[in-house]
């Protein structure tokens, strides 16, 4: 990665002075903007695109919240910050930042209330189809495998995917509401403005150089600069250097906008901020809806299972791509299989596992043994190897099924492997950027995918919008407070 070097303040003549500059107006930047204004700051927010929203606007809109939010309570679910933290410590690891997760869980209910207060509504209804936003406007869903092994043993299973009240994907609607909150605030928004580099004075970030209409302007920020400029999934050089597997064949499934090019991260590094986990990325391999497709089994190149198929699709995708090189089939039959929203079809069919294995180029004896062992246990209603839940256990290829088949989920054969980056700048519980010694880089903040995610190794849907808006708020507020010191 090539850092974008900061410019010394002694070489700059500032054109404007404000309290806080926010770079990027996706969900993280919008919440930082509103929070800084609520704290009394004079805020200037710049957005590289003509229309704000970023990757957030194209997302499903799930926000990972819990600990007993009013929506959870209204839907009949009991949760606590401690239960939420127990799940996240395990599900997002290994290597999680425990302090940030604990702060997130303790403040989650208050954050829900704040989102509602600035105009983001939620309907008190639960959707029982997990791992994605509801097809209607139901507000609550299981979104991270909370109800599947091994996490159902580490914490009480509770849904925490909160979707704003909108039919189907709600990311655009969320950004409409957050954008309206920004518009109602006294913040000034400059679109089509590209941050060029940070300005530093004796190690403190004191401003930013901005290109607007091909003219450079120097903006001084008394309280600090909040970098909320996205991740780096569309910077091919950074992806090749840090997480090459995230460069999946179909560019449409590298989730982000062209502006997710790592510029905010590179600017932060150029001002002295440290990075972490640039090698970590999310990879979702959706298998539905309907989730009933999980009654099939996933096998690798060796013809063996490698995961419980009823778990979170992001966990399946990560294991499939990182550990199995994207060589995966789902073994099913003509009774278990059913039409699905993704159009997944049985690509190969046979009467015996050995015959099917020849089509799949996997060891026949291994696939036959896998099916035998699985069917024997499934007939008893158990899965001692991977602990798939009873509703998803059914012998495969036995009467009334007429044979067995395989859905082709290989990464280079058209299956959806949706990736985005999770690594970024190191930050504390207030969104302040840290250097390699763990000290704050004075005047510098980061949120959203410019900052390293709470998801240290694995993901849960809604974490990006969750930690982006949560720590974006904190960053904006802390920068505003710093302006008054």
Regions found by a protein language model. Name each.
Residues 38-59:
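Glycine-rich FAD pyrophosphate-binding loop
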Residues 169, 213-285, 465, 471-474, ...:
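Glycine-rich loop(s) and the adjacent beta-strand/alpha-helix scaffold that form part
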Residues 197, 368-458:
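A glycine-rich dinucleotide-binding beta-alpha-beta segment and adjacent secondary-structure elements
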Residues 103-216, 236-237, 371, 378-405:
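Conserved redox-cofactor binding core of oxidoreductases
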Residues 257, 261, 265-267, 271-368:
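An anion/pyrophosphate-binding glycine-rich loop and adjacent beta-alpha core
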Residues 64-104:
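Glycine-rich active-site loop/strand segments that organize a redox cofactor
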Residues 1-20, 38, 454, 458, ...:
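Extreme N-terminal leader/targeting segments of oxidoreductases
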Residues 20-45:
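N-terminal Rossmann-like FAD-binding beta1-loop-alpha1 element of flavoenzymes
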